[in-house]
Amino acid sequence: MPPDLPSLLLRLVVLLLLSQAEARSFVVDREHDRFLLDGVPFRYVSGSLHYFRVPPVLWADRLLKMQLSGLNAVQFYVPWNYHEPEPGIYNFNGSRDLIAFLNEAAKVNLLVILRPGPYICAEWEMGGLPSWLLRNPNIHLRTSDPAFLEAVDSWFKVLLPKIYPFLYHNGGNIISIQVENEYGSYKACDFKYMRHLAGLFRALLGDKILLFTTDGPHGLRCGSLQGLYTTIDFGPADNVTRIFSLLREYEPHGPLVNSEYYTGWLDYWGQNHSTRSSPAVAQGLEKMLKLGASVNMYMFHGGTNFGYWNGADEKGRFLPITTSYDYDAPISEAGDPTPKLFAIRNVISKFQEIPLGPLPPPSPKMKFGPLTMSLDGNLLSFLDFLCPQGPIHSVLPLTFEAVKLDHGFMLYRTYLTSPVLEPTPFWVPNNGIHDRAYVMVDGVLKGVLERSLKQELYLTGTVGTRLDILLENMGRLSFGSNHSDFKGLLEAPLLGQTILTEWMMFPLKVDKLVKWWFPLQLMKRALPQASSVPAFYSAKFPVFGLLGDTFLYLPGWTKGQVWINGFNLGRYWTMRGPQQTLYVPRLLLFGRSINKITLLELENVPHNPQVQFLDKPILNSTLHWGYNFLLSETQGSFEPMELSGH
């Protein structure tokens, strides 16, 4: 063999690989109003799935079911705040392992439509923007404000190089990337900002990747930008022909694309469970596919807002989003195929081949209980453990952002400096409670005040009376004209016309306390019922037989947070609804050892403090919207008080 032959063969192999990679392309064919994938006419039928709402061990299951439904792509967001919890500190491990999710999609031959933001909406906490941005109170989010752009640039210089190898023309599965998200619905209409983002994406990802925008029919003017492919979003109730004609005003040539075809809708606490009928969703999909459109179904599997990650809207009043993000999607929150999935699959089969073989059956479910919950202690009893560094002192109350607290709860404390002998109104001006205040006098809960509601709470006290306000962040605004949603007491409270000053702020590390549960066992104490909320309750339980998914049911409990074996399952609000059960994936349970459930009940404990685990969810039982609980001094129990919104 000639001495140069091995090196010659190596060069040939490299050239062959390069030519194959060069052949990979995903482009817009404007002349024929279509996409071309590797030079061949192509359209995607995609579905949305958010890796951050699904435990990692279930990613493969959900993606396989999507592929077996006839989809050839998956669309998902990247929430900035999920990956950069503090400036310059990044997390891409575990449930945040974006690369692992891309690989799981590739295993089932799903192409990827990526939506990295920086703003994503997604009904996610602050629309995916990190709340630490608000530590600069003068920052203008989603604009060309240099302070915002500096943070965005730093983030994308970390994120985008990670995904570069996964671009389709580089041999990966990412065929297109969205710039921003529904920017036309935002008040700023800052084209300088959009041009900056487009330039940043091009600088970090090159010229070959297809960049696009998505907006609603009325947001196209401010959301579209030359050089970015314009797409639209709408649902089954909209007129397909009319909406696509609006899109043609901004994108005269090229494929029609609905980037968010709504298979269902989100739920707010206190409103009816949202649904979309299967026939309507299927009919709308068929109309679009007959027009040759590419479609992404939002959502195909919704998942769960575990922990504190739910977002919120403001539509005349503050509307936090439920823990369940089931979305009435084709694949349920528990990962099960629904009749809607089969209706969609039938439509897709008319236009392209469906993978052979049946879909996997629903996962095993189990039910057990009831379990009796035991009182571990009043929240105030554990203040030294919840805030080991001690309080922050200020004449006027500080916000969550000012003390660098992103989620959860903060306790505000002050003492009366003069007697208040007659019942006197306690209030916070300018809707300054963000979002829910549990007001205690000398450790006894006197009432609850809530953002956007007109409320009255009358207090009395003597010199030295302790006033505690437990402030709950119920999720930052994820959509609308203002994402600068500061949390905590935004104004100084008043007692009558007297401004209360000299505050102590205790940022609470509730999740750490639950995980380090030994302090509660050391300090467990019996407290009278009247002073037992906010309080921790817990129970230990075994699980016998085959583990299955289940749904935690909390009859009679009011509002709070729940943990299973230290994992923050999310918020419950049974008194307001519509969600009555919380999805518990079987992976959170131990089959051969003792499990533990922990509740932080904020308002009212049932006379029979029990919980149950059901084999079916209850998502559609709205009970009350405007209500409060005030302590009746005559009866020694909590009674509802009707309230009206602004």
Swiss-Prot record:
Taxonomy, superkingdom: Eukaryota
Keyword annotations: Glycoprotein, Glycosidase, Hydrolase, Secreted, Signal
A Pfam family recorded for this sequence: Glyco_hydro_35
Catalytic site positions: 182 (proton donor), 260 (nucleophile)
Signal peptide (from-to): 1-23
E.C. numbers: 3.2.1.-
Record's subcellular location: Secreted
Molecular function GO terms recorded: beta-galactosidase activity
Glycosylated residues (UniProt): 93, 239
Entry's transmembrane regions: none
Family indicated by similarity: Belongs to the glycosyl hydrolase 35 family.
Function per UniProt: Probable glycosyl hydrolase.
Protein name: Beta-galactosidase-1-like protein
Gene: Glb1l
